[in-house]
Amino acid sequence: MKTEKNAQLRLAKRPQGEAGPDDFELTHDQVPSPRDGEVLVECHLLSVDPSSRTHWNAGQSYRSMVQVGQVIDVGVAGRVLESNHPDFSAGDYVVGPGGIHEFGVIPGDQLTLCDTRIAPLSSWLGGLYMTGLTAYFGLLEIGQPKEGETVLVTAASGAVGMVAGQIAGIKGARVVGVAGTDEKCQFLINELKFEAAVNYKSLTLYNDLREATPDRVDVIFDNVGGPLLDTLFRRLAIGARIIVSGATSQYNNETIY
């Protein structure tokens, strides 16, 4: 292991607008060794989420920014190779914050043990990790949907949106999704059993929304922001709740909408 190289993707420079290949650098370094309380993880799966884009800018955010030269930070799931933390042993599968690399040293206190008998490793990094928890707590603690209410989810075919829509359905709400293609809208209706779905690129967007939400909208779970959210405001019911989960339409913009 000590002679094996560790492929890592680093931030070469801060992107201007949409990120491209020149903004990143692939390096090959020595595999690191864990210190006290740390765990060496062989990364099998990476969760590269839209919110990662916000960490590559200059300035401040709700979390620390990736500095130029640093490894791009993402959620990872993988196998423990070496552990200096009492809760983990070699061979365990874990999920937690890491980077785009083959091998990473992660503080054990930031890792969760994955029982792959309960769910596959991909689920531990998806619906049972950050995207699923974002949907779960955002919808239930802030949205608090009630049976019979209308819940509208933007970016509904994305990782967070799909889970939010399923939870809303379990709670007995009427679920409407917004997505960017007709194929995604059909997926929401046919596979995820949304009551209705609207393509936000439609030339008749507001009329489509009005038809899909005849009783207006009680809860908006918004992952997109920008002009689309402005349009959705016009469909709000009295006493409506809005979960501001993300703003994917704005992550590549240099100016705030």
Region annotations inferred by a language model:
Residues 227-257:
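Glycine-rich phosphate-binding loop and adjacent beta-alpha segment
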Residues 125-203:
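Mid-domain Rossmann-like dinucleotide-binding core that forms the NAD(H)/NADP(H) cofactor-binding site
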Residues 30-48, 56-100:
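Glycine-rich beta-strand-centered segment in the early N-terminal region that forms part
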Residues 93, 150, 174, 240-242, ...:
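Short glycine-centered segments of the SAM/dcSAM-binding site in methyltransferase folds
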Residues 72-82, 89-155, 197:
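NAD(P)H dinucleotide-binding glycine-rich loop of Rossmann-like/cofactor-binding domains
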Residues 204-215:
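Short amphipathic alpha-helix with an adjacent loop that forms part of the alpha/beta core around
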Residues 101-102, 180-188, 254-257:
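Short, glycine/polar-rich helix-capping loops at beta-to-alpha or helix-loop-helix junctions
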